[in-house]
């Protein structure tokens, strides 16, 4: 009987030791989440710092539209030619949902209201800039969506997708019009007029982006 009790006690102790050993090899989920969040935050901050160097004038960027390297002052001179062009405001925002920031700069000509925007983003180790007219990026929202207007041919709401050296719209809802037809779309699918206006109302209700004085 003593021998049986002894063997049973030994087996229990071994089981406990094995259990502890297995548990010690299981990584902490909390630790993994913390490390991922830390990496994401550092990634965002690093890119934002590079973009901020450009808007402060401490560094340059490559203009896709002018196809040359410019400072912000150079850009305003090149953009305006005979007009007085100024950057009046900016917003830090993730336009294409890639977990990295872009900076959108608001442009005025001759002290008039917004005439367009310059979008700065980090690509392949450097900062590049894309020009947008006012009608290409109307009423920018905090989630990166906005309205656009190409006359009666095509108008609606979208977000941006950046390609190798350009950009394109990912259309959320839009309406196209010809001489005899008006067609409504949501996410690329034809829908009823009522469904379209419901999507428009949802977009209009979104919080606007926070603009900071430049």
Task: Write out the residue ranges for each language-model feature.
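Acidic, small-residue rich beta-repeat scaffolds with periodic aromatic anchors
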Residues: 22-61, 145-214
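C-terminal motif of bacterial Sec signal peptides marking the signal peptidase cleavage site
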Residues: 16-19
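Acidic/hydrophobic-patterned starts of short beta strands in beta-sheet-rich repeat architectures
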Residues: 97-107, 143-147
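Extracellular C-terminal loop/segment signatures of secreted glycoproteins
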Residues: 115-140, 167
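Beta-propeller blade termini
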Residues: 86-95, 136-145
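Blade-edge motifs of beta-propeller repeat domains
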Residues: 32-84, 125-136
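Structural motif
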Residues: 112-118, 155-159
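Positively charged n-region of N-terminal signal peptides that target proteins for export
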Residues: 1-6, 11
């Amino acid at each position: 009987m003593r021998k049986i009790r002894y063997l049973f006690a030994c087996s229990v102790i071994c089981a406990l030791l094995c259990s502890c050993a297995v548990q010690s090899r299981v990584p902490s989920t909390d630790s993994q989440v913390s490390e991922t969040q830390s990496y994401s935050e550092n990634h965002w901050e690093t890119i934002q710092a590079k973009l901020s160097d450009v808007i402060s004038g401490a560094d340059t960027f490559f203009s896709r539209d002018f196809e040359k390297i410019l400072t912000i002052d150079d850009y305003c001179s090149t953009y305006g030619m005979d007009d007085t062009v100024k950057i009046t405001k900016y917003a830090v925002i993730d336009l294409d949902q890639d977990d990295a920031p872009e900076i959108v700069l608001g442009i005025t000509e001759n002290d008039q209201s917004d005439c367009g925007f310059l979008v700065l983003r980090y690509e392949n180790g450097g900062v590049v800039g894309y020009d947008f007219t006012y009608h290409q990026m109307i009423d920018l929202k905090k989630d990166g969506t906005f309205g656009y207007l190409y006359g009666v041919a095509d108008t609606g709401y979208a977000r941006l997708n950046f390609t190798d050296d350009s950009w394109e719209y990912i259309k959320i809802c839009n309406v196209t019009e010809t001489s005899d037809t008006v067609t409504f779309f949501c996410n690329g699918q034809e829908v009823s007029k009522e469904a379209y206006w419901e999507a428009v109302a949802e977009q209009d209700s979104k919080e606007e982006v926070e603009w900071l004085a430049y």
